[in-house]
Amino acid sequence: MAKEELIELDGIVDEVLPDSRYRVTLDNGVVVGAYASGQMRRHRIRILAGDRVTLELSVYDLTKGRINFRHKDERRSDAAPRASARRR
């Protein structure tokens, strides 16, 4: 059986909810509930309110999505680079 087609959309995280869930407003104005993908959880990528994200929606339920990418924030580009941790 072939995997179903997913719809990829961009949006902005409005609110961080309990249990690793998020409320995201898509670029077209629709508000959906979302969760972080397994890769993002495994690599401990933090998602905060105001972050720009890409999510996948199933064609069967357009109210829930999976966040699979957090875009780089242009505002943080002027911050000093993090000092490397030294092992002893």
From Swiss-Prot:
GO terms for molecular function: ribosome binding; rRNA binding; translation initiation factor activity. It comes from the Bacteria. It holds the Pfam family eIF-1a. PROSITE patterns: S1_IF1_TYPE (PS50832). Keywords: Cytoplasm, Initiation factor, Protein biosynthesis, RNA-binding, rRNA-binding. It is found in: Cytoplasm. Transmembrane segments: none annotated. SUPFAM superfamilies: Nucleic acid-binding proteins. Residues 1-72 form the S1-like domain. InterPro entries: NA-bd_OB-fold, RNA-binding_domain_S1_IF1, S1_domain, TIF_IF1. One of its GO terms (cellular component) is cytosol. Belongs to the IF-1 family. One of the essential components for the initiation of protein synthesis. Stabilizes the binding of IF-2 and IF-3 on the 30S subunit to which N-formylmethionyl-tRNA(fMet) subsequently binds. Helps modulate mRNA selection, yielding the 30S pre-initiation complex (PIC). Upon addition of the 50S ribosomal subunit IF-1, IF-2 and IF-3 are released leaving the mature 70S translation initiation complex. Component of the 30S ribosomal translation pre-initiation complex which assembles on the 30S ribosome in the order IF-2 and IF-3, IF-1 and N-formylmethionyl-tRNA(fMet); mRNA recruitment can occur at any time during PIC assembly. PANTHER family: TRANSLATION INITIATION FACTOR IF-1, CHLOROPLASTIC. NCBIfam families: infA. This is Translation initiation factor IF-1 1.
